[in-house]
Design a protein with these regions (language model features):
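Extracytoplasmic cell-surface/polysaccharide-interacting catalytic and binding patches
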Residues: 1-183
Length: 183
């Protein structure tokens, strides 16, 4: 899947403000809205207030980044479209629980183990950058669902070469699963 988010958050040299005992990057207090990192080690703050506006199809996105999203989609000349933007904690809970149920049904594993497996593909509630209103999942021309097959397309190459110009990055590269916790 293609999950892009505005700006990047680069871990600095490890010290008491950026590294936990487990070695995972810790979000510094007071990080700017466009540098927020959300993952299993940095959940959404309970008091985080999204500034959302409605985008095509009723999806919501952060109002401070919507113009960059529109510009990126426009520059792609119809070869990409938005699949998923902001998700409420309730929706994330539903998606996660559905994945847990699927893992349990397919593997026979108990719930605790199924949750661990599910969390590698669907973020636990409160640990998805979609909960901020800054993450985007894109569908590429010719695809009706999220697929890794698009990685071999010219459109994917264009996105990787140009998304940073619009303030977006590929948030979960395949070779960084140990760092991001997301496959």
């Amino acid at each position: 899947t293609s999950n892009l988010q505005t700006q990047s958050t680069k871990p600095q040299a490890q010290d008491s403000t950026t590294s936990s005992a487990s070695g995972h990057y810790v979000q510094p207090a007071g990080a700017k809205w466009n540098l927020k990192l959300v993952n299993p080690w940095n959940p959404v703050d309970s008091d985080y207030a999204q500034s959302l506006v409605t985008y095509a199809g009723g999806n919501k996105f952060d109002s401070r980044a919507i113009d960059k999203l529109k510009a990126l989609v426009s520059a792609a000349n119809g070869k990409i479209r938005v699949a998923s933007l902001y998700r409420t904690i309730e929706l994330q809970t539903k998606l996660f629980n559905n994945k847990v149920s699927q893992v349990m049904a397919n593997t026979g594993k108990p719930r605790v183990e199924a949750e661990t497996i599910a969390a590698t593909e669907v973020a636990r509630p409160g640990t998805s950058e979609h909960n901020l209103g800054l993450a985007v999942d894109f569908l590429f021309e010719g695809y009706s669902s999220l697929s890794e097959k698009f990685e071999n397309t010219a459109t994917y190459t264009w996105m990787m070469q140009n998304c940073a110009e619009y303030g977006f990055i590929l948030r979960f590269p395949k070779n960084k699963q140990a760092v991001t916790g997301v496959s």
